[in-house]
């Protein structure tokens, strides 16, 4: 059994190659401490979703751009897009002219540490789902010093199997595992170990530093071994020398602490990964979708050797997908794949240094280039033949199915007689079929084929009528597969040339877009990314598939699509100083959303009728009588704890694993806190009736900050909702209804949807905090999207950053910092700038709003000013746009709540008996805490948190019910009969899980 080291908060993937009918025999034994184990499978064809070559970048910046774009498309990090949005906002604000436009098209790449950090922050379950893993068997938690073994029958040939050894839940403890997995061949019952004994390695004490920089080929050419510098997991740790082994037979790259340590620390299947490299800095980045390795060679010769070897893994996968050939001929790598120089006549197990291998793949690269140069698109008749053959296959299969129902086996005597007369000819026929099929087996495996079975020599084989039909069908299928390969290659070349015209546009993708994976841009060869806009334009001009007029039209469509994508994915597109560019993006997005998407291809009358129906169907807002609300809340039963004393009591402990006392909370959840955004919703209704709506929308965007005007509010934090916890808010007096739900636990993500007769607003938010010693920076990462139903005008903005100051000592308070913008699809925008506070001046409350009309408008620029704790007014007309509402009586003793906030946890007559069991108002800990029963609230809080942990550990976590994920950072409200308000109308909570 091999030994595997698993770092804390990490995991290890062990891959197994097998075929249909095989049995995987495995043994797992954790040493001392337990480990979580699951068996997954992943489609072999998913290699087409990755780059099929090592991507060579001309410099490190381009390399990081490419890797960042690859992460964006794969979903390797849910925070990357937001990082890009913020980075792009900064770059837009500091550039103008042509430089500004060029930056708008390009990626703002992450640093090497940022790429690793973002990848590590994603929960393992999300990584598995995003990378295409399917759970086969959950082994569960294996206790320390306990041997678990079992067998798993393989029922398909289209998958790699993977053992996931999960230590991500352990915050500090590293684990050591004894592991073995062997494949028992289904045909001859022979056992094939998935890992041979590690090949002999040089003795570390006898080697100089120069020798350590050399590469070695061992195990009869099966392995390439040598040292590389590997970027460590944590920030600022730099690179560390590690010993790497590339197994050509399985296409896996593993690494160890050094050359005399047999404990594996990680493994990646190259053909299922994206590999990018930069020769100038000798960097290689491997992204498997599960983890990111950043490697660095010590010399350019070593870098080239590793790149060529990694490229060979891709070529083996693409050129010969029948893995059985490789399994039966392990020495094929020495004969056919010149990964490194030929070995000397000495024993193959002797270690021989390698040289550079530029010529190893040059033939393939030149061949591919020549094919691209002479490429002629297939005629339309080929595609017609392809469709016709599909129908013929369907008909023949149907006929064989009918014949098999009436088929009766013949006697042994009849079989023998029949064989004597037919064996000779059938052998030739079958052998021809084998040759034909093996030549075109890209989409099928030998175990699936009748032709893959050898012709028996004992003459007990007979070709009856049904068999002959199936044999003929197989020959036909083999031709079909061959034709499919040609068409597929034709399609790839077309896609590649079309994709090159939109290199800089496919980075921002909205939920309504159909797109190719980013990796298809480097399809089947090594390509240097164009660095400039001119290079991209040259590619468009050189494309032979489009005429001049078609080319212009195509470019316009791509640009239009790109504008929609940029606008819908983040507010980044609107934070540029180029007002025309910003306005064009929003207009195009608005235009496309109304006419371009398939779901919106309706007539004008149909759209209006739908809107009318939606407006009249705002259930629960037409309550027959006025609802009386309490506008107050009981006084707090306990004072908030001192954070300084809490830290003193927990010196040296991991604060993330320590539960804060319930007295550190206020009696509302985060869902209810964010719902306070709509306290001043009448501003939106007023905006729909005014010629200058952006003025009132800007006031609404700022009004949320006013909940912190009483400094008592900053002494406590809201309760953290459980996964799938909900909160509804019906304000019939203001004419809107709201539903919110916690849709993700790690990272915490909350989705909101509010609607009124005149407007609707959606918001997906991920709260984040940064601790700065005596203060905390708070960010609500997400875009508020507002739409006016009558005019179709769209508004977007992000909530401003706030700072919680004097965290340890002094009077604690909250204040907004920096600036933010509100953008309209009609070209208007507002710029909100908060006053900066002096070192000894206390809280800063002043701010200014600049209303900037589009250049084509005759309206003049307006300025608004005010205090976010009081009001906002127009400096020219002195019209009061907004002013704060009332606080509860004696707010110092009542958590600093406003009257609006005090009503959030009340169950009024409009909610009584109608709420789902997941609503925050029904949480027993919040209810007990509001009523002053602190001990009971503490008990319930711990109990609910423990129940949620148990559900998660058992793999039985609840799923969101009312929102669906449409992109990495956006969840969309579900409409139709399964929508929240339809369920509430019918009181249909039948499939809702009990959270408490």
UniProtKB/Swiss-Prot annotation:
Residues 642-982 are annotated as: OSBP-related domain (ORD). GO terms for molecular function: lipid binding; sterol binding; sterol transfer activity. SMART domains: PH. The modification Phosphoserine is found at residues 190, 193, 324, 605. Residues 582-603 have a biased composition (Basic residues). CDD domains: PH_Osh3p_yeast. Residues 558-577 have a biased composition (Polar residues). The modification Phosphothreonine is found at residues 210, 323, 325, 352. Residues 75-114, 338-372, 556-611 are annotated as: Disordered. Interacts with SCS2. Belongs to the OSBP family. Present with 589 molecules/cell in log phase SD medium. This is Oxysterol-binding protein homolog 3. The lineage of its organism: Eukaryota, Fungi, Dikarya, Ascomycota, Saccharomycotina.
